Amino acid sequence: LNFGTLSSLYSNVDVASTAGAGSIIVTCTPGTAISIALDYGVNGGSATQRYMSNGNSSTLAYQLYQDANRANVWGSSTLALSVASFPSTTQTYTVYGRLFATNGFPAVGSYTDTVTVTLTY
């Protein structure tokens, strides 16, 4: 998921994954119950917010969601996406991201995080 190049961050930045760029593609037997969990990243995130780091001491807060309205956080355990009966052999799941606004200017740099996807069936 790429939030792009930003010169300021005075308002939230919303993005959505695409096939080959952040979407989760699952191939499974139809009718199987599955759960797709996302961990909170390597920079000390939580169900409230995740963090991207520039490799130094600067971080930017963001979150990942299951829906375009950004109402349902996509996380682990009870915040995982549950599918009671997998509908077809292959499904693509979009990940919706929000980079939260900051007061002032964040430190210059490339900010990254690594989020692990766990599929349980």
PLM regions: where:
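Amphipathic alpha-helical hairpins/coiled-coils and adjacent low-complexity
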Residues: S57-T59
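Glycine-rich, pocket-lining loop/helix-strand segments that form or immediately flank
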Residues: S53, Y62-L64, W74
